[in-house]
UniProtKB/Swiss-Prot annotation:
Descriptive protein name: Innexin shaking-B
MF (Gene Ontology): gap junction channel activity; photoreceptor activity
Localization in the cell: Cell membrane; Cell junction, Gap junction
Organism, scientific name: Aedes aegypti
Entry membrane topology: Multi-pass membrane protein
Segments in the Cytoplasmic topological domain: 1-21, 127-182, 289-372
Keyword tags: Cell junction, Cell membrane, Gap junction, Ion channel, Ion transport, Membrane, Transmembrane, Transmembrane helix, Transport
Biological processes, Gene Ontology terms: gap junction assembly; monoatomic ion transmembrane transport; response to light stimulus
Regions of this protein lying in the Extracellular compartment: 43-105, 204-267
A GO cellular-component term linked to this record: plasma membrane
Keyword field contains Phosphoprotein: no
Stated role: Structural component of the gap junctions at electrical synapses in distal and mid-depth levels in the lamina.
Family named by the database record: Belongs to the pannexin family.
Subunit description: Monomer.
Gene label: shakB
Length: 372
């Protein structure tokens, strides 16, 4: 098991340059690694053995029957899930059928789980890929190795001046750059909600309330309720195989199939249900947080003061008052990457320059001061 995660840690590396939020990293780093690990686990015989084992008479070769039932779907009977195991049925959902398809629950997902998990991992990484493309290495370029703070005073002074000149010359031109990141965060929210609906479709409408059903089942009298994990992920199902008999007539053969992979699948998807709910809540709160930041300069001042206590309050207020939301976002990202003393000096120098130059050029009308 550890070998799988060792192989994945290089696949989803977190850069030492911080260009996004912790919640955003949960999507493209932790979640992607979890999904990729699950995808590999369900394809590894070392952990689950053969994916399907069907039992029948010797008239049908075992490999033929297993292959047929793996390629086609297996089924259970809905009316038999509440029957008493051991006296009425051998296993929930398994028993004699009347040949009608009305009562059948077909399990079509079984062989597609690993591919679905892999596809989900790609979808979770897509907003990160988009932001990397849009961010363009701006933060790393502006850092100029000022994050370590170990360089000569002359070199440090030159780099701080270059950074200050860039901020001065491009002040109020970073809104679209910041909005692109907010779009990526919103796409992460759309993705995780969309994947809940995707998995609900994948499991024939049984996934959306899966976690709640499991909790309800654990709290109720289990003799009176259907186990949702057994209902969605049965260990034993039936498979119908047709072949010609010795007289040329079509013969129907019912086989019992053991699905050992579902022991793993149920754990995977009960975890993913709760994990996706947590991600949805955290990302929704993050989106509301971003909306407040966009429309509230006071909140931007408060957050900078809270995060970077070495920077003087009056310097922060001057910068926020004379800049836009995109500049705030860039400065916040720089502050999380630069040496704290260097960032304090840059912020103070920028505030002094803004204070001494009241007519700094502004896009739009001359002399206009915009808060957003």
């Amino acid at each position: 098991m550890l070998d799988i995660f060792r192989g994945l840690k290089n696949l989803v590396k977190i850069s030492h340059v911080n260009t996004d939020s912790p919640v955003f990293r949960l999507h493209y780093s932790i979640t992607v690694m979890i999904l990729m690990a699950f995808s590999l686990i369900v394809t590894t015989k070392q952990y689950v053995g053969n994916p399907i084992d069907c039992v029948h008479t010797k008239d049908i070769p075992e490999e033929v029957l297993n292959t047929y039932c793996w390629i086609h779907s297996t089924y259970a009977l809905k009316s038999l899930f509440l029957k008493k195991v051991g006296s009425e049925v051998p296993y929930p959902g398994v028993g004699n059928s009347d040949g009608k398809n009305i009562d059948k629950k077909i399990y079509k997902y079984y062989q597609w789980v690993c591919f679905c998990l892999f596809f989900q991992a790609i979808l979770f990484y897509t907003p990160r890929w988009l932001w990397k493309s849009w961010e363009g290495g701006k933060i790393h370029a502006l850092m100029m190795d000022l994050d370590i703070g170990i360089c000569s005073e002359i070199e440090k002074k030159q780099k701080k001046k270059l950074l200050l000149d860039y901020l001065w010359d491009n002040l109020r031109y970073h809104n679209w750059w910041a909005y692109r990141y907010y779009i990526c965060e919103f796409l992460s929210l759309v993705n995780v909600i969309g994947q809940m609906f995707l998995m609900n479709r994948f499991f024939d409408g049984e996934f959306m309330t899966f976690g709640l059903d499991v909790i309800t089942h654990m709290e109720a009298d289990q003799e009176d309720r259907m186990d949702p994990m057994i209902y969605i992920f049965p260990r034993m199902t039936k498979c119908t195989f047709y072949k010609y008999g010795v007289s040329g007539e079509v013969e129907r053969h019912d086989a019992i199939c053991i699905l050992p992979l579902n022991v793993v699948n149920e754990k995977i998807y009960i975890f993913l249900w709760f994990w996706f709910i947590i991600l949805t809540i955290l990302t929704t709160l993050t989106i509301f947080y971003r909306i407040i930041i966009i429309f509230s300069p006071r909140m931007r001042v408060y957050l900078l003061r809270l995060r970077f206590r070495l920077v003087r309050r009056d310097a922060i207020e001057i910068i926020v008052r004379r800049s836009k939301m995109g500049d705030w976002f860039l400065l916040y990202r720089l502050g999380e990457n630069l040496d704290s003393i260097i960032f304090r000096d840059v912020m103070q120098d920028l505030a002094n320059r803004l204070h001494n130059n009241q007519h700094h050029r502004v896009p739009g009308m001359k002399g206009e001061i915009q808060d957003a």
